[in-house]
Every structure is written in structure tokens, then in C-alpha cells.
Amino acid sequence: MERFDAIIIGAGAAGMFCSALAGQAGRRVLLIDNGKKPGRKILMSGGGRCNFTNLYVEPGAYLSQNPHFCKSALARFTQWDFIDLVNKHGIAWHEKTLGQLFCDDSAQQIVDMLVDECEKGNVTFRLRSEVLSVAKDETGFTLDLNGMTVGCEKLVIATGGLSMPGLGASPFGYKIAEQFGLNVLPTRAGLVPFTLHKPLLEELQVLAGVAVPSVITAENGTVFRENLLFTHRGLSGPAVLQISSYWQPGEFVSINLLPDVDLETFLNEQRNAHPNQSLKNTLAVHLPKRLVERLQQLGQIPDVSLKQLNVRDQQALISTLTDWRVQPNGTEGYRTAEVTLGGVDTNELSSRTMEARKVPGLYFIGEVMDVTGWLGGYNFQWAWSSAWACAQDLIAAKSS
């Protein structure tokens, strides 16, 4: 049986980065993945350009039952540290919006960078390999793969969550945690589009493809100001993806379709200047024409001129456009979700090393645990930061 200092399961962002760091420090590392190639989810991210971090990373941008858990790792390996690595590899990047950093060229550059870093550390890759069983004894862990048995002193689970099953997502990491007696919190899809109840969906389907700036608010008071997109299945766009992580089934969300306009002042000014102008054309100054026309067809916008708009109807209109209350039917689920909420309970792990408190030598990094970031590079930064924290402990084990 071949033995390694550390075996890392999952050749995604966290797994590759942790492997590279430990390998370059002299640890003998085996990196296992069930896919044909490493970094499959990285390649799909950011529209193929990989939103690899965010300039404004802070603990408040992460959801967890223990909101303090992420603080240590994020402080010890920051976005600036990862940007330094990207720069060292000569990868050109740009800020798109809200601090989101993307490769100028392709997400493949980030994958190539991580593979290169792994090769510098003499990391052994074992792709297309399924882990059939994991056992622990006094010397460490023994893994039964399809066709071979390997052993290690340290075992790192970097298998991610359940989002995007088409890219190989599975509950493997949760099963390992449960096998060793660790608590796993309920999971659900995060950063995911909303589906709508049939009557509302049928009313809005003709708007598929229309995007508008918005402010969207969850019942718990969480607010995001980003674009909203109407789709054939419901509502999407950055604002919806963000708020979906804070939404619970049965709850409403409030949507302001005119976040940059004081609608009452605007209507009063336009009424004084252009009393005979239609309300529809007035609103089309700030809203997509297709949206205005559809809302008028649905009776949400009166078919009147500005001088005919009475106070009661104006107040109802303002409420419709700035506090549109929608009760989603659900979400599109893991198939299109960018992340998985919940996972391995962080109370089971050391926030400094990511090691399981009950099981020395067993670590969890990245999305598999109950830490979920906002849209916009935050989840990649958690992958880098948690991987770095874990790697430092793998390295320290060698020196001790």
C-alpha cells in the first residue's frame, strides 16, 4: 500500500490550492478526484472567466450558523494574497463591478496556475478515481479506491457541496463527516434563481430577458442592490441570486424596480411639466418599455395621462413599483445553484486549522462546510483562505 503524508479528496479550487501549498513545503501529497480533469467548476465560473476573488471580502459577506468561524482564515490569507499569486503567474485581470475580479482571458488560466503550483510541489494527481471507503487507525487513514488502496497521516475533504451535479457534485463529504460522528447541518441551494407560482409566472413570462436595476429585500431585512432578470421560469439576475441565500420557503421578498428614482417627486414634476403625457410613456423614461406595457396590460399601471392620475392611484402605483411583494414558489435547486448552504457544522472544526475536533488528522475545506459567501468571488476566496489555513497545519505536522 502506497502511503502519503496527506491525501486531499476533491481537485477543485480549495483542494488544488491546499495540495500545492503542502506539497511545496515538502509534504508528500496525493490529490484525488472523480472527474477527468481538475477544476471543472472553476472553468464554468464567471461566465468562463472565473470571478476568482473580491476586493471587498469581509466576514459579514458570509452565511454560517457560526458567523465568527470564517474570520481567522480570511484574515490570515486575504484577497490581496491571492491577487499576488495571480500577478506572479502573469494573469491579466479586471474589476467588473462591486469589487468582483475576473480574468481578462479565461478561467482556464486559474486552473493552469493551480496545476502548475501543484506540479511545483510534486503533488500526485489521481483523476477518475472513486473513493469507495475510508477507514481510520492509529497510523492515520486508509482509502480504498477503485483498483488500489492508499494510506495517509492526514486526510483533507475538499469535495464541495451539491450544486451543479452535472459537474460531479455529490454528498461524499457529508457522508465522510457523518461516518466519523460529525454533525452535518441541513443543506439547500444558494445563489439560485427563483421559480414562481403558475399564475404569476404566466403573467410575467413574456418579459423573459428583460433586466432592471433593483433593490431586493428579504423578510429578515437583508438587502441587495443589483440587477434583476425576468426569465421563462421566474426571476434571476444578481439581486435574486444574492437574496435567495437569505430567503426561506413561504416567505415574501420586496422588490423596488426604481431604486434610483424618487417616484412621487418624479411624477409630480412630470405632471406639472407635461400634464397630457401618458403615464406609460412617463414611466418608460426609467423602466424598460416591455415591462411598462406588460404591467399596464395586467392593470398595475393605469392607462391615463398624468393629469388624470389621482392621488389614490398614484400611491398604489408607487407601492407596486417600489414595494412589489413576491412570494416565490421555490428555487431552481441544485441544478443551477452556484453554491450549497449548510454542510459540515463549523462547531465541529477548528477555525484556525479546519481540523475536526473529534477526529485528529481529518480536515474539511471549502464549500463542504457551513460557510457560504455572497455572489461575486467571495466563495472562491473562502476556498483559498480555508485551504491555506489547512495547509499550514499540514506543513506544521511535518516540522513537528
Swiss-Prot record:
InterPro entries: BaiN-like, BaiN-like_dom, BaiN-like_dom_sf, FAD/NAD-bd_sf
Annotated SUPFAM superfamilies: FAD/NAD(P)-binding domain, HI0933 insert domain-like
Cofactor(s) it depends on: FAD
Catalyzed reaction equations: a 5,6-dihydrouridine in mRNA + NAD(+) = a uridine in mRNA + NADH + H(+)
KO phenotype (gene knockout): The rRNA from the deletion mutant lacks dihydrouridine at position 2449.
Residues reported to bind FAD: A14, D33, N34, R40, G46, N51, V131, E367, F380
Key words, A-Z: FAD, Flavoprotein, NAD, Oxidoreductase, rRNA processing
Enzyme Commission number: 1.3.1.-
Gene Ontology cellular component list: cytosol
Tree of life domain: Bacteria
Similarity section: Belongs to the BaiN/RdsA family. RdsA subfamily.
NCBIfam families: aminoacetone oxidase family FAD-binding enzyme
Cited function: Catalyzes the synthesis of 5,6-dihydrouridine (D) at position 2449 in 23S rRNA. Can use NADH as a source of reducing equivalents but not NADPH.
Protein name (record): Ribosomal RNA dihydrouridine synthase
Organism: Escherichia coli (strain K12)
Gene from which this protein is expressed: rdsA
